[in-house]
Amino acid sequence: MQLGDMSAMLKQVQQMSEKMQEAQKQLESMTAIGESGGGLVKAMANGKHEIISIQIDKDVLDDVDMLQDLIVAAVNQALTEATKMAQEEMSKVTGGMMGDMNFLKNLNMGG
């Protein structure tokens, strides 16, 4: 590989790194919502897989066991949606170069 080729490749890597950092910042402001019990419990996550809010309808406050199950289901759905959102956003940056890697599922976007 010639020096010019190596320089061009390094420049491309740097540009991709900058684009990925920008995409990660965008993910912080994106939200995904999960709900359970027909909307009785709603959880909101950002693109960094952080739960940022939980809303609970007062009608389920009397049944703690059901409430716990509904919270878990809503949070899991919100995190699944956040993962899909992150994968789509990063795919835009990489142009599909990374294929169908599932590394984002376990990626701690928080640093």
Curated annotation (Swiss-Prot):
Pfam families per the UniProt record, alphabetical: YbaB_DNA_bd (PF02575)
Organism the protein comes from: Chloroherpeton thalassium (strain ATCC 35110 / GB-78)
Protein's UniProt name: Nucleoid-associated protein Ctha_1157
Species classification: Bacteria, Pseudomonadati, Chlorobiota, Chlorobiia, Chlorobiales
HAMAP family (UniProt xref): DNA_YbaB_EbfC
Subcellular location as annotated: Cytoplasm, Nucleoid
Keyword DNA-binding among record annotations: yes
Classification via InterPro entries: YbaB-like_sf (IPR036894), YbaB/EbfC (IPR004401)
Function statement: Binds to DNA and alters its conformation. May be involved in regulation of gene expression, nucleoid organization and DNA protection.
Plastid recorded as keyword: no
GO CC list: bacterial nucleoid; cytosol
Coiled-coil ranges (or none): none
NCBIfam families from the UniProt entry: DNA_YbaB_EbfC (TIGR00103)
Assembly and binders: Homodimer.
